[in-house]
Swiss-Prot record:
GO cellular component: plasma membrane; proton-transporting ATP synthase complex
Pfam family for this entry, one: ATP-synt_DE_N
Main subcellular location of this protein, as a coarse class: membrane
InterPro entries: ATP_synth_F1_dsu/esu (IPR001469), ATP_synth_F1_dsu/esu_N (IPR020546), ATPsynth_dsu/esu_N (IPR036771)
Family: Belongs to the ATPase epsilon chain family.
Function: Produces ATP from ADP in the presence of a proton gradient across the membrane.
Compartments in which it is found: Cell membrane
Protein name: ATP synthase epsilon chain
Keywords: ATP synthesis, Cell membrane, CF(1), Hydrogen ion transport, Ion transport, Membrane, Transport
Bilayer disposition of the protein: Peripheral membrane protein
Length: 124
């Protein structure tokens, strides 16, 4: 199976680095899927978007992201997010409460996290 190297990094931490068969991301130009040997490109991630990674040796990973960029070369996909959280790390009850927060950053992060949870439960 063909594979591509993927790195998902936020301002706060490195979330994942490894080999994947496909990566999908929501960009300002729409949702894109990146397979091995994809044409090089640079994309801007949407606010409150979702990134999915299908590792070659494991279960699909889903992250909620808050802005950033996606860089694609023939051999590597690098996702640099302002904020990112794995769907399994999201406390849905707390995130739902944060949607009503006056803190815009907390609200935005909650939206990104909840979108990741929804995408993860879709099983796509």
């Amino acid at each position: 199976m063909a594979e591509i190297t993927v790195e998902l990094v936020s301002v706060e931490r490195m979330l994942w680095s490894g080999q994947a068969s496909i990566v999908t991301a929501q960009t300002t130009e729409g949702e894109i899927g990146v397979l091995p040997d994809h044409e090089p490109m640079l994309g801007q991630l949407v606010e409150n978007g979702v990134v999915t990674i299908q590792p070659t040796d494991g279960d699909r990973l889903v992250a909620g992201v808050q802005g950033g960029f996606l860089s694609v070369s023939k051999e590597k996909v690098t996702i640099l997010a302002d904020f990112a959280v794995w769907a399994h790390e999201v406390d849905s009850a707390s995130a739902e409460a944060d949607l009503n927060s006056d803190d815009e950053l907390a609200k935005a992060r909650a939206e990104a996290g909840l979108r990741a949870v929804r995408r993860s439960s879709e099983g796509l």
